[in-house]
């Protein structure tokens, strides 16, 4: 399953870069991250959180303690639920990494279910926004 391999590679990279916590919000688009976490692709603390807003603010709290957290959410409106936490982290100059499992680019803007263009969604409140295309 290529998407699980990609999620594993991303999580392993986060681990190597010093990310300490992954707060995972379950969803069908982000399921490969759940499988990769279960397989041990991330060596830090990983925990499921059902509400994206809760995950965002839990990540902000962890960042305030000196941790380097990441929140993983699914597609559609889930990323919008992180906006208050992203703005809080931005204003407080706290590290917060957001991974959103969006639909492929060709499904955006054509009426596909749960396809919200997430690239650049947080505007100037983030240091970078990267859109990875799916791998074959």
Language-model segments: what does each one mean?
Residues 2-136:
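N-terminal alpha/beta PP-like core and its mobile active-site loop of ThDP/TPP-dependent enzymes
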């Amino acid at each position: 399953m290529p998407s699980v391999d990609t999620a594993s590679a991303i999580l392993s990279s986060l681990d190597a870069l010093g990310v300490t916590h992954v707060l995972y919000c379950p969803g069908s688009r982000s399921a490969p991250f759940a499988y990769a976490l279960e397989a041990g692709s991330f060596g830090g603390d990983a925990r499921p959180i059902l509400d994206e807003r809760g995950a965002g603010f839990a990540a902000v709290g962890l960042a305030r303690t000196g941790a380097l957290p990441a929140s993983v959410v699914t597609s559609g409106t889930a990323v919008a639920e992180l906006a208050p936490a992203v703005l809080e982290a931005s204003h407080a100059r706290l590290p917060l990494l957001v991974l959103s499992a969006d639909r492929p680019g060709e499904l955006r803007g054509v009426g596909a279910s749960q396809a919200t263009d997430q690239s650049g969604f947080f505007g100037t409140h983030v240091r970078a926004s990267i859109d990875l295309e799916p791998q074959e």
